[in-house]
């Protein structure tokens, strides 16, 4: 299996990307097609004693920056690591693409270069979010700010497939993020989406879920538009950071706190591990014809390695093929009777 990796994407590129890809080659047995400034990548590898075994490099001269307008960048920076990498994926030179680069550029590129599955207007950005009982899949978490009901139904189908194939959960539960549990709550779009989800084949829809209940992790998939999802995601990250900071302050405040920390050290370490987003890899663009994984922009080696593991799992389980079959079933169910 060959995974295409953007060597120039993210705050810590190319060093962290190199370290993560080298670890992935060793641990997962994958081949890497690294796209980026070859001279810089080779020099960084040599300076840090990082082996390039199993890593083939493809040179490119441009990088899409976070400040670039996504659609314009995809059109004009043809020799950027993202555009070159996505084209290599489209051409069958690799099985999946991983990048910690611009989310907007990846969304546009996944739509225009890799293209989308039948029944998908635009790919949804999905991510596993830590929660009390178990992590849940949140989609869309930022790619599509406004969504029609049929888009939310497609998200539900794809999210259910992902949690089943990649996370290994049987008959995953799907909920619609809303401001109330009752069917009558929400905007007209959410009310219509609720009715549509009740009759969507292939998913186990459990109704609306209020934001206060989302962190409990009682459902496997939470469906929403990209604006709502991004708010949920960033609020979760902020609250987690705040709580860990408050715990640290409490433990360091006095001698008693330090003693308490020694007694609770194992539990605190487990909590930090559970809340570490790098453990979950990256955020897939569900709905692209081939796996495109967005690693966090601040990813270190572990995050890159786990994003590659995630891409490998998607390919091994034919996630895109499974989603296409489920989407075709959805389209057939919603086809008007003649």
Set out the residue ranges of the language-model regions.
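N-terminal phosphate-binding or glycine-rich loops at protein starts, especially the Walker A/P-loop
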Residues: 1-42
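Short, glycine-rich nucleotide/cofactor-binding loops
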Residues: 5-14, 143-153, 294-301
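Short glycine/serine/threonine-rich phosphate/pyrophosphate-binding segments
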Residues: 13-17, 41, 79-92, 96-110, ...
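Glycine-rich phosphate/diphosphate-binding loop of Rossmann-like nucleotide-binding domains
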Residues: 15-16, 31-33, 39, 145-207, ...
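Short helix-capping segments at alpha-helix termini
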Residues: 25-28, 46-54, 167, 197-203
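Phosphate/nucleotide-donor binding subsite
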Residues: 50-94
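Glycine-rich phosphate/nucleotide-binding loop
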Residues: 111-124, 130-138, 218-222, 226-336
């Amino acid at each position: 299996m060959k995974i295409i990796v953007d060597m120039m994407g993210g705050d810590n590129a190319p060093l962290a990307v190199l370290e993560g890809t080298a670890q992935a080659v060793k641990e997962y047995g994958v081949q890497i097609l690294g796209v980026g400034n070859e001279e810089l990548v080779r020099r960084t590898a040599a300076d840090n004693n990082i082996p390039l075994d199993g890593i083939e490099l493809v040179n490119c001269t441009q990088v899409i920056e976070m400040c670039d307008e996504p659609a314009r960048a995809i059109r004009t920076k043809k020799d950027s690591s993202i555009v070159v990498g996505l084209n290599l994926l489209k051409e069958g030179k690799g099985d999946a693409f991983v990048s910690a680069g611009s989310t907007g550029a990846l969304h546009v590129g996944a739509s225009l270069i890799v293209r989308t599955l039948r029944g998908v207007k635009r790919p949804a950005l999905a991510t596993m979010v830590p929660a009390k009982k178990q992590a849940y899949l949140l989609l869309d978490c930022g790619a599509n700010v406004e969504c029609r009901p049929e888009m939310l139904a497609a998200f539900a189908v794809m999210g259910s497939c992902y949690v089943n194939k990649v996370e290994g959960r049987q008959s995953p539960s799907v909920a619609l993020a809303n401001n109330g549990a009752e069917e009558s709550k929400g905007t007209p779009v959410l009310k219509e989406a609720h009715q549509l989800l009740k009759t969507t084949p292939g998913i186990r829809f459990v109704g609306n879920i209020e934001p206060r209940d989302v962190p409990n992790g009682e459902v496997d998939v939470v469906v929403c538009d990209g604006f709502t999802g991004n708010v949920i995601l960033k609020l979760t990250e902020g609250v987690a950071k705040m709580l860990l900071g408050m715990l640290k302050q409490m433990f360091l405040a006095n001698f008693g706190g330090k003693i308490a920390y020694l007694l609770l050290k194992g539990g605190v370490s487990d909590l930090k591990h559970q809340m570490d987003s790098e453990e979950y890899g990256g955020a897939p663009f569900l709905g692209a014809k081939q796996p495109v994984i967005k690693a966090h922009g601040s990813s270190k080696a572990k995050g890159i390695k786990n994003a590659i593991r995630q891409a490998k799992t998607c390919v091994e389980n034919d996630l895109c093929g499974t989603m296409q079959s489920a989407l075709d079933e959805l389209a057939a169910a919603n086809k008007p009777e003649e």
